[in-house]
Amino acid sequence: MSTVVVAKKAGKVCIAADSITSFGDLKLSSYYDAAHDKILSHDENYIGIVGSAAHQLVLESVFASKKVIEKKIDIDFSSRLSIFESFRTLHPVLKEKYFLNAKDEDDDPYESTQIDALIANPFGIFGVHSLREVIEYNKFWAIGSGAEYAIGAMFAVYDTAETAEEIAQLGVAAGAEFNNASSMPLSSYVVELQQSVAK
C-alpha cells in the first residue's frame, strides 16, 4: 500500500508520500519504477492517492483530457464542497470511460469511487474518501497502510517542528520505518497558503 501525508503550518502546506509499489508479496521499489512518485499535480493542486496503482493513471488521464482542459468538466479543489462536487461530476466519467467498478459493500449508502486521496493546495489540506466524503484538516493527516505511524509521528512533532515540510517528511519516514508496505525515498511538495487561509 502506501504512506501519504499532508501537513499545514506557518502559512504553508506540504504533501509527501513514500515510493514503493507492491502487488501482493511482490514489491517494486523506486530503483526499478520509473514513475514512483505517488503525488500528481493538476493546476495548483497536489493529489496523493492510495489503493490501486491504476488510480493515478486514471486521474492523470482525466486531468489531461480535452473536456477538463477546455473546462467542460470543471475540476475545483478550493473547498470541501467544490472537491465533493468535482468528484461527484467525475464519478460517472470514471464509470463510463474508465470502467470503474463502483461496487463495494452491499450496505454502503452510495456507490464507491474506490479512491482515497489527500489534496494540498493554496486553500488548505483535504482528504477525499471512497464515498466522496471530503474532510478539511487543520494541522495534518495521513492515509494508507502506514497512516497510523505517520499520524502518531506528526502529532509528536507538530508543536516543535518549524515547517509543514518537516512534519510531513517525518510522518512518511515513520510510515516507511514501521509499515512493511511503505518505503523510502519520499517525494514532497510545498505550497504557500493564500493569505486569507493562512491566518
Residue ranges and their predicted role:
Residues 110-143:
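Long, charge-patterned amphipathic alpha-helical coiled-coil/hairpin "stalk" segments used as oligomerization
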Residues 165-180:
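Short, conserved aromatic-histidine micro-motifs
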